[in-house]
Amino acid sequence: MYAIVEIGGKQYKVEKDHFIYVYRLEGAEGSAVTFDNVLLLADNNQYQVGAPSVAGASVSGKILEHLKDDKVTAFKKKRRKGFRKTVGFRQSLTKVLITSLN
């Protein structure tokens, strides 16, 4: 059994007892979180497709930790002018354990 759920503007395929990394969510580590925007719910060969979401379906999870992704480096340069600029960015992420698909 799996579900396609929209979290933070992105779509994730989730299954029970699996981890997903999503953009930072509000909430403390160890707290429960519920995602109500379920786009598809699949069980064996039966599919429930929402328009745009499945009515009454939800995905429950537990926030395990807040962390940062690897650094992405951007480099700008203008030729013959001596202008060079380096900028780094680290995306804040949340690790979520999926506990149930309802």
Curated annotation (Swiss-Prot):
One of its GO terms (biological process) is translation. GO terms for cellular component: cytoplasm; ribonucleoprotein complex; ribosome. The keyword rRNA-binding applies. InterPro entries: bL21-like (IPR028909), bL21-like_sf (IPR036164), Ribosomal_bL21 (IPR001787), Ribosomal_bL21_CS (IPR018258). SUPFAM superfamilies: L21p-like. One of its GO terms (molecular function) is rRNA binding. Belongs to the bacterial ribosomal protein bL21 family. This protein binds to 23S rRNA in the presence of protein L20. NCBIfam families: L21. This is Large ribosomal subunit protein bL21. The lineage of its organism: Bacteria, Pseudomonadati, Bacteroidota, Cytophagia, Cytophagales. The gene is rplU.
